[in-house]
Amino acid sequence: MSDTKVYPVPDYIREKAHITKDTYEEMYRRSLDDPEGFWGEQAEKFLDWFSKWDKVYHSDLKNGEIRFFEGGKLNVAHNCLDRHLEQRGDQTAIIWEGDDPNNSEHITYKDLHERVCRLANAMKARGVKKGDRVCIYLPMIPEAAVAMLACARIGAIHSIVFGGFSPDALKDRIQNADCETVITADEGVRGGRNVALKSNADKALESCPDVKNVFVVKRTGGDIDWKEGRDIWYHEAVADVSADCPAEELDAEDPLFILYTSGSTGKPKGVQHCSAGYLLGAAMTHKYVFDYQEGEVYWCTADVGWVTGHSYIVYGPLANGATTLMFEGVPTYPSAARCWEVVDKHNVSIFYTAPTAIRALMGQGNEHVTKTSRKSLRILGTVGEPINPEAWEWYYNVVGDGRCPIVDTWWQTETGSILIAPLPGATDLKPGSATLPFFGVEPALVDPEGKELEGAASGNLVIKRAWPSMMRTVYGDHKRFMETYLAAYPGMYFTGDGARRDEDGYYWITGRVDDVINVSGHRMGTAEVESALVLHDAVAEAAVVGYPHDIKGQGIYAYVTLMAGVEPSDELKKELVKLVSNEIGPIAKPDVIQWAPGLPKTRSGKIMRRILRKVAANELDSLGDTSTLADPTVVDNLIEDRPNK
C-alpha cells in the first residue's frame, strides 16, 4: 500500500544532526555487542553521579530481575536542576502556556530549583520521607512538574493520576499505592471550562482514611470544601519554609515513580520505574530521537498524567537542560489554530503529539494551519498509536510544509522511553512505520508458539534483552509483572503488540495483539483496515473491531467519524466498502459500518476498543469501567445508533 513511499533525510537536518546513518549503525551495533561498555559510557555522558556504580547491569528476564548501575548513587532532581544552575540558571526551563491564550509564564532553571526545594521542605515538614508514596492529582500547571521533582529530590515516590480521572479511579490508585499525601488543586481549566479536582479528591478520600496531607494549589479560587488538619494551601506551605533543600543521595535502582496503566481490567496495575535507568532512557531518547539542539524550544502536548508527559515534558528535557513547553489547554480552543499559534508565539522547534490529535485537526481543515507561519518548526513527532499514512502525509506536508522529518515513536508506559523510532539525521522515513530500534533495543517477531521469525514477517513483537528504562515490577505484585510481560515468551519481554517487519528491516506496528480480527481464517490487523477507510476524503477517523459472525467466525465492524459538513449516506457506505476491498482485498470488506460522531477515548486520546467490541457484539451489560473516558456520553450515542440492535 504505502510501503513504497520513502522520504530521505533532508540535507539541512543531516548536516547538524547528533546522529547520522553511519553513527547510528556503529552505535547500535556496539550497544548490542558491548552493552556493558556502551551503557557505562552513556550513563557517564548523560547523568551526574554522586558515586559511581559497581556493575553496569544484571539482567535475567526469565526470573524478572533487571538492574542497571547497581551501587551507583544519584538524584533525579539534581540531574534535572542543580547541575544546570551554574551554566544556565537564567535560561527558561519551562514555558507554561495557559488555557487562556493571554496567560503564559517563563520559569528559569533557578526559579524552578527554588520552587522544588520549597515544596520538598514543605512535604518534609509534614512528615513525608524517602520511600513514601505521594499522589499527584493536578491539572497541567507548573506545580505538577514542581511536585514530581520535589518528590524525586527527597526520595518520595510519586504516583500521578490524570486530572480527568473519576473519584473512583483516583481512590483505587491512592489505595493501591498506599499514599498518605495528595497534591491537588481547587479546579483545573480546560477548553474554557473549569474542571472540579478538589471535590473529586474529597470524594475519593472518603474511602482513604490513611491520607494525612492534602496540599491544595489555588488555580481558580473556586469554592471548595476544607478539612482542617488534613488540607493545607500549597502557596502557604511553600512560603513558610526555606528555599534550600539538599538533594537526597539515592541508589540507582531506588523507585522514582509508579504510574497506573489505563485499560487494564481488575485492580489497577502500577508500573514501577527506577531512578537511574529510567532517567538515562528519557534523556538519551529526548536528545537523539528529537535531535534536540541547544537553545531550542521543545513542546510535547501530552499531559503529565501519562508516561509521555513524565518522560518528554519533564524528565527527559530537563535532564538535558532544555526549554520545555507545558500546555494547559486543548488543541481546538479557542480555535483549531491554537497549536500553530502557540508554535509561532514561543518559536517552538520540536512538536510531539498523538495521531488522534493530528486526525482531529486534519478534520477541521487546512486553513487553521496555513494562516500561521510555523517557520520555527524543525522536527515533528507522533506518539500513542500507529499513525495512518494519510494523517502522516497531512502532518508532513501541511503542518511541516514538507521540510520537517516526522519521528513516529513506538514505546509504552512499561518501557519508560522510546524503543523504536527514526532518528532525524539517520533514518529515511516511510509514512506509518516506526522504522528502526533505538540503541540497546533488540526487537524480534515471534509466532504464537514463540518461534522467532526471520526477514520480512508479521508476528508478536518482543524485546530480547533488558534496557535501562524498562519497568522493574508491578507495584506490590511482582507475580503480575512476570505473568503479564515475561511469561508468554520466557527470556523475552512481550509487548502485547503485533508488528510487521518489511524487507528493509523497518517495523510497522499493527496494533494490540487483541486488535487482530480473524476473518474466515485470515488474520487482519485493525490498523490496516482503518488506514484504508481514512483514505476517503469524507472520513476523519475510523475504528475497526471484530464481532461474532455466524459464517466467518469474526466479522469486521467499522465505526466511522466523518469530516465536518459531510452527510452520511448509503452511497458513502458503499464507497467505503469498495475502497477497503480495493486497498486490502475483498476479505477485508467491513460487514457493518456505523456512523460515529464521536469515538470513546481516554483522555490521552487512546480509543477504548474494548467498549467498541462490546457494542458491536451487543454485550451491553458488560461494558466495564467507563470512568476513564474523556466523554462517557459518546458510548450512549453509539449504543443508541447501533445498526445491529
Swiss-Prot record:
Which top-level group of life is the source organism from? Bacteria
Q: What are the record keywords, sorted?
A: Acetylation, ATP-binding, Ligase, Magnesium, Metal-binding, Nucleotide-binding
Documented EC number(s): 6.2.1.1
What are the annotated GO cellular component locations?
A: cytosol
**Disulphide-bridged cysteine pairs:** none
Q: Which reaction does it catalyse?
A: acetate + ATP + CoA = acetyl-CoA + AMP + diphosphate
List residues, modification N6-acetyllysine.
Answer: 606
Which residues does the record give as ATP binding sites?
A: 384-386, 408-413, 497, 512, 523
What's the cofactor?
Answer: Mg(2+)
Q: Where does CoA bind?
A: 190-193, 308, 520
Describe how it is modified after translation: Acetylated. Deacetylation by the SIR2-homolog deacetylase activates the enzyme.
Q: Can you supply a Gene Ontology BP term from the record?
A: acetyl-CoA biosynthetic process from acetate
Q: Which residues bind Mg(2+)?
A: 534, 536, 539
Q: Which InterPro entries match?
A: Ac_CoA_lig, ACAS_N, AMP-bd_C, AMP-bd_C_sf, AMP-binding_CS, AMP-dep_synth/lig_dom, ANL_N_sf
Q: Which GO terms describe its molecular function?
A: acetate-CoA ligase activity; AMP binding; ATP binding; metal ion binding
ATP-binding keyword on record? yes
Give a Pfam family name: AMP-binding_C
Report whether Cell division shows up as a keyword of the record: no
The record's PANTHER family line, in alphabetical order, gives:
ACETYL-COENZYME A SYNTHETASE, ACETYL-COENZYME A SYNTHETASE 1
Q: Which family does the record assign?
A: Belongs to the ATP-dependent AMP-binding enzyme family.
Protein's job: Catalyzes the conversion of acetate into acetyl-CoA (AcCoA), an essential intermediate at the junction of anabolic and catabolic pathways. AcsA undergoes a two-step reaction. In the first half reaction, AcsA combines acetate with ATP to form acetyl-adenylate (AcAMP) intermediate. In the second half reaction, it can then transfer the acetyl group from AcAMP to the sulfhydryl group of CoA, forming the product AcCoA.
Report the protein name in the record. Answer: Acetyl-coenzyme A synthetase
User: Which organism encodes this protein?
Assistant: Alkalilimnicola ehrlichii (strain ATCC BAA-1101 / DSM 17681 / MLHE-1)
Q: Which gene encodes it?
A: acsA
